[in-house]
Swiss-Prot record:
UniProt keywords, alphabetically: Cytoplasm, Endonuclease, Hydrolase, Metal-binding, Nuclease, Ribosome biogenesis, rRNA processing, Zinc
Molecular function per GO: metalloendopeptidase activity; RNA endonuclease activity; zinc ion binding
GO BP: any one term: rRNA processing
Lineage: Bacteria, Bacillati, Cyanobacteriota, Cyanophyceae, Synechococcales
Chief location bin: cytoplasm
Cofactor notes: Binds 1 zinc ion.
PROSITE patterns, alphabetized: UPF0054 (PS01306)
Its biological purpose: Single strand-specific metallo-endoribonuclease involved in late-stage 70S ribosome quality control and in maturation of the 3' terminus of the 16S rRNA.
Subcellular location: Cytoplasm
UniProt-annotated binding residues for Zn(2+): H136, H140, H146
Protein name in the entry: Endoribonuclease YbeY
Disulfide bond residue pairs: none
Pfam families, per database record: YbeY
NCBIfam families: rRNA maturation RNase YbeY
């Protein structure tokens, strides 16, 4: 399976010295392809059949600032203030997915400023926090959700597995 990644970054949210490989498109492409192979390759995990069988998947990954994500959070979730990650699935109902060689998954939007704060609060690197947030967003694009504590625990366990596998 091949991934077509559209990466957009507002580098102004980070100092030049902080960026390094954090916002490198090739690094994120390899990481996302690896995570998709894990989820799609394990029949015990929920993943839309059309995604499992697709020759090509496509998604957008956007790194932005708190002001921009706060606007999106207000518009799409009717919540005030910034959040860490938002996912916009191309299709929420698996029955609506169109068959074809390429499947559009949707977009993952991450606030670099919130990610930096959370990394500092958790005592780990910004890279680790970004990987956590992007993996969480990816699972949402694949249909995972956490309306209750049990489903949240299951989703977080899968995130830990993804991060542990590279």
């Amino acid at each position: 399976m091949e991934l077509d990644l559209a990466l957009d970054r507002e580098e102004g949210a980070l100092q030049a010295s902080e960026i390094g490989d954090l916002l490198d498109e090739t690094v994120w492409l390899q990481q996302l392809e690896h995570w998709l192979q894990i989820v799609c390759g394990d029949e015990s995990l929920d993943c839309p059949t059309l995604v499992r069988s697709a020759e090509e998947l496509s998604l957008g990954l956007r790194f932005i600032d708190d002001a921009t994500i706060a606007d999106l959070n207000s518009t799409w979730r009717q919540k005030t203030g910034p959040t860490d990650v938002l996912s916009f699935a191309a299709l929420d109902d698996a029955g609506d997915w169109m068959e074809g060689p390429s499947i559009e998954l949707g977009d993952i939007v991450v606030s670099l400023e919130t990610a930096r704060r959370q990394a500092q609060e958790q005592g780990h690197s910004l890279q680790q926090e970004l990987r956590w947030l992007v993996s969480h967003g990816l699972l949402h694009l694949l249909g995972w959700d956490h309306p209750d504590e049990k489903s949240l625990a299951t989703m977080l366990a899968l995130q830990e597995r993804l991060l542990g596998d590279g």
